[in-house]
Amino acid sequence: MASRQGSKSRKAGLKGADSTASSTTSSSKLYQETSIDGHSSPASSSAQSKQQFFSPDPLPQTAQRSKENVTVTVRFRPLSPREIRQGEEVAWYADGETIVRNEHNPTIAYAYDRVFGPTTTTRNVYDIAAHHVVNGAMEGINGTIFAYGVTSSGKTHTMHGDQRSPGIIPLAVKDAFSIIQETPNREFLLRISYMEIYNEVVNDLLNPAGHNLRIREDKQGTFVEGIKEEVVLSPAHALSLIAAGEEQRHVGSTNFNLLSSRSHTIFTLTIESSPLGDKSKGEAVHLSQLNLVDLAGSESSKVETSGVRRKEGSYINKSLLTLGTVISKLTDVRASHVPYRDSKLTRILQSSLSGHDRVSLICTVTPASSSSEETHNTLKFAHRAKHIEIQAEQNKIIDEKSLIKKYQREIRQLKEELEQLKQEIVPVPQLKDIGADDIVLLKQKLEDGQVKLQSRLEEEEEAKAALLSRIQRLTKLILVSTKNPQASRLPHRFNPRRRHSFGEEELAYLPYKRRDMMDDEQLDLYVSVEGNHEIRDNAYREEKKTRKHGLLNWLKPKKRDHSSSASDQSSVVKSNSTPSTPQGGGSHLHTESRLSEGSPLMEQLSEPREDREALEDSSHEMEIPETSNKMSDELDLLREQKKILSEEAALQLSSLKRMSDEAAKSPQNEEINEEIKVLNDDIKAKNDQIATLERQIMDFVMTSHEALDKSDIMQAVAELRDQLNEKSFELEVKAADNRIIQQTLNEKTCECEVLQEEVANLKQQLSEALELAQGTKIKELKQDAKELSESKEQLELRNRKLAEESSYAKGLASAAAVELKALSEEVAKLMNQNERLAAELATQKSPIAQRNKTGTTTNVRNNGRRESLAKRQEHDSPSMELKRELRMSKERELSYEAALGEKEQREAELERILEETKQREAYLENELANMWVLVSKLRRSQGADSEISDSISETRQTEQTEGSF
């Protein structure tokens, strides 16, 4: 943060004096000492103090702080006139005070701590979402308030607001000073820092030279090195610094806003407080930080951007994505690593998100249906953040290194030095009765002592004036309530809420009107052409710098010059000035100087001086609040001169009284009488000077009244002049944009005519192509169908013939088998009979007969053989015929099988042809579908055409006919 964050990672056991704490400033490890001559202002600090030690507030056991969750609220903005004109509908709405529900799907709903409708004011949002965080910060508990949402959802309006409706940051600053006013038993020191994160680069908005600052980390946490911190004395002082920082912030025009935030900003208010008076000795100092974060809006990928805007959007989305990832990891108890280092935003806010700060998240959403998805993502992010548990702790600095302690010690030391200077004034001893001889010697000693005393008095007067100025300057930095310290602050908690009334001087530093809800004409004007973004950004940035509203506008350029020169003397002048707090509502804070309380120097003044102070007090009552730092400085200078003259007059009165006593004792001493006369003349001259200064003060007060009246007139004239310049600039820009739009319109008209001709040609080509394709396809399909029918008839005829031949062959084969079986049985019988006869013949013949009748037997045998062969031939002739028939039947079967094989081959070939036909038909269907796509595109671009519809109907009838085939 702007200064070091507290040590949030310390263990629970280290809650004593050994715990490390956050330091009070943040650019280096040593604090820059402030010299008396004013070359280094205590009001502006950019140095880093040494290591400090603090511990959480040891609460009683009955009041131990319990865990709590992040406060999450949702704020709806109303529909813009542009969205209403475009007919946008409400997609999300607030269902009661805690529920957000989807209009189209009521089952989708999310619950939060509070949901604010479009009519809710920012003051009500502050009371619910931010007041408890600010109140805790004033008590020593760190706090962080986020504004999260998409572009044009109202984040910057919620955080900064305008003169009619101040935002969270002005209300928080005003509330902080109101709490100081209501806490009379403590004294406070407030300082602020303001930074931005643009394209992952950290810039200091209070110091134009502070670019690309580095983020450091030590045992105490993360801090930004070199960030400038400014001590603030009043709400107007703080708001003026914020306004100066806003002029340095990166903004630009987008498709949604004329002036859209292109960077994340972190406004840090560091609060130190200690018990008032002697109670502060040895007491711990409460140290806390209040971080008010205005996040840049996430951008959808649907938004067409280029160049710088695209680069900015990518960095913004990256940091917001990292923030969402960190939130998801913090809600996941199983997550072991949280990617804080993936983005500068999460790394700076690491201490705030670690669970020891009180955090409030304000999600701004739009109910428009065109942003329904982005709104849903925002609601889911808020829902995840609601589950983060925190345990807020009070931080106390237990050493003497805090800035408020340093100022208190320096004030005490300066007062002691002032007392020593007063005591070192050696009174002139009382003259006793002396002789005439010693008169000359005493006269010479008196002259020498008078010269030395005069020079010493002059030196002491200069030293006292410097010490008084230094004491007053340091005392003004510490803010103290004007209420009675004996009054307790507790009863005010039960009273009605205090109202945040802003004076004219404070409202002067707020924007004149909210920038996120632009007029329709301006919005249409500045988003019409993409290429003019950079020119419009530069022009409106200059216009933003020159347009200032309020009574103190004429001082702002001078203030910016001082800040740009980076001189510490400007901060000194600012610190010397009386805080200009508006007198409104009774809740303003008076920063009073405690120099007059118990000061011995003030007791030495005479009654005429008291009368002059009474006159001065009356002039204070008549004085109205200063309208500028210049008036305040001049008035303070006149008062300081009068005080110095009064002190010199008091010293001369004491010297006059002493010399009067000496003159009474020695009335003959002419030198003493002359010195008394000189002192009387000096006192008279000083009284005349004091009277002149009083008249100047009164004239200055009266002049300030007249200046206020003149400033009102000048303000009205300046506002009219600004409005005239604004309208003329808008008229010029509108005329230029109109010319560009007219040129673009002419180009688009020519393009439309060319496209119409192309569409007509395409229609004609499409109709011809459709007719040709349909005719060709029909002819091909008819030819294929005819060929298939003929092939089918031939195959059926051939199949019938083959079936008949097969049945005939089967009949012949069965008959041949029967005959062959009968013949085989007869052959077997004949063979058996022949064997039996041969056996009988062998048994009947004797061996001798066989020998004698060998020849006869042989002849008989041969004859028998011949007869048997003849008989066998007679028997074999039918079998040969059967074999021949069988052989013929086998040949027929083989021919039948060959015919069947040819038939199968023909069927396979026909199936292949049929498959190719189907593939060709599918190809033609795909081509027809492509033609239909082209026809649909043409019909969407030019409307329904009767000729195309007729062709479509004919094509569909053709497809139905083909389907029947």
Curated annotation (Swiss-Prot):
Which Gene3D superfamilies does UniProt cross-reference here? Answer: Kinesin motor domain
List the SMART domains: KISc (SM00129)
What are its GO cellular component terms? chloroplast; microtubule
| Bias kind Polar residues: ranges | 29-38, 949-965
Comp. bias regions, Basic residues = 551-561
Per the record, the GO terms for biological process are: microtubule-based movement
Q: Which family does it belong to?
A: Belongs to the TRAFAC class myosin-kinesin ATPase superfamily. Kinesin family. KIN-7 subfamily.
- Please give the name of this protein: Kinesin-like protein KIN-7K, chloroplastic
